[in-house]
A protein has these predicted regions:
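Long amphipathic alpha-helical segments
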Residues: 1-45
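Glycine-rich oxoanion-binding loops at beta->alpha junctions
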Residues: 52-54, 95-116, 160-162, 178
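Glycine-rich phosphate-binding loop
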Residues: 112-150
């Protein structure tokens, strides 16, 4: 977010020279264009909703509700953060489905979709305002829930601090919370959980 276009271009060039893909988060349109101008021979892809820049194509098409991760948002204003999490997981080869606009202001919307969450191994819940969605969700489902406070809101909710404090003070045991607007961090937490599950399955099979 605070790196210059020149610094980002240098990092991408070093990754390219090593044959490694790269994902850069918190990149706006102007900076993405500036980086692309500095690297004319690179096939960079800017993902405007997620505000990310990748050195390889990343597709989010065709993801269904059977994906191992489901990302929920309280409202459509949370979409950029949810998309950042979804893209970060896709970059790692993990499919994540989106379930938007299921905030606690209309709790019936979440309750009627609970059956769709059964196949997910990890849930990421993005919410602004008072940030209640992750707490409510963690009280309803057995899967790991990762809460992402979002900076949308007004009054005392402005900036996401109220949502962060609410999630940290949650009475739902085991709720994981990342920093404000940190969709990428939530994705990496989900990836670690999935990696542990996979390693345990492999270990168990090895013992057989």
């Amino acid at each position: 977010q605070h790196k210059t276009a020149e610094q980002i271009a240098a990092i991408l060039e070093s990754f390219h020279n090593r044959g490694e893909p790269a994902l850069v988060t918190r990149v706006d349109a102007a900076k993405a264009a500036a980086v692309a101008a500095l690297l004319p021979g690179h096939d960079l892809q800017w993902h405007h909703q997620a505000r990310c820049l990748s050195s390889v194509p990343i597709s989010l098409d065709g993801i269904d509700t059977a994906a191992p991760v489901t990302i929920l948002s309280g409202g459509t204003s949370d979409l950029p953060v949810a998309k950042e999490a979804q893209l970060a997981l896709a970059f790692q080869g993990i499919a994540a489905s989106l379930m938007l606009d299921v905030g606690v202001a209309g709790l019936h919307r979440l309750l009627e979709r609970l059956p769709l969450l059964r196949s997910a191994q990890v849930l990421i819940a993005c919410a602004g305002m008072e940030g209640a969605l992750p707490t409510v969700l963690a009280g309803l489902v057995p899967q790991p829930v990762i809460g992402v406070p979002v900076s949308v809101g007004y009054g005392v909710s402005a900036g996401g601090r109220a949502a962060l404090d609410g999630m940290l003070a949650s009475c739902a045991p085991g709720l994981t919370v990342v920093n404000i607007d940190n969709g990428y961090g939530a994705a990496m937490a989900a990836l670690r959980i999935l990696s542990c599950s996979t390693e345990r399955v492999v270990a168990d099979r090895g013992e057989e």
